[in-house]
């Protein structure tokens, strides 16, 4: 189990999870606010 935790904390695994989350977030933002190059309401 300790080796599995070490594997999950390596940079490629963390980067894959992060970029997957970021891509999903951007897809959902573009679904609700299509073609928004700028977000004037922030």
From Swiss-Prot:
Localization per record: Plastid, Chloroplast thylakoid membrane
HAMAP family xref list: PSI_PsaJ
Name this polypeptide is given: Photosystem I reaction center subunit IX
InterPro entries found in the cross-reference section: PSI_PsaJ, PSI_PsaJ_sf
GO cellular component entries: chloroplast thylakoid membrane; photosystem I
Described function: May help in the organization of the PsaE and PsaF subunits.
SUPFAM superfamilies with a match to the protein in the record: Subunit IX of photosystem I reaction centre, PsaJ
Keyword entries, A-Z: Chloroplast, Membrane, Photosynthesis, Photosystem I, Plastid, Thylakoid, Transmembrane, Transmembrane helix
One biological process term in Gene Ontology: photosynthesis
Segments traversing the membrane: 7-27
Recorded topology in the membrane: Single-pass membrane protein
Domain of life the protein comes from: Eukaryota
Family label: Belongs to the PsaJ family.
Lineage per the UniProt record: Eukaryota, Viridiplantae, Streptophyta, Coleochaetophyceae, Coleochaetales
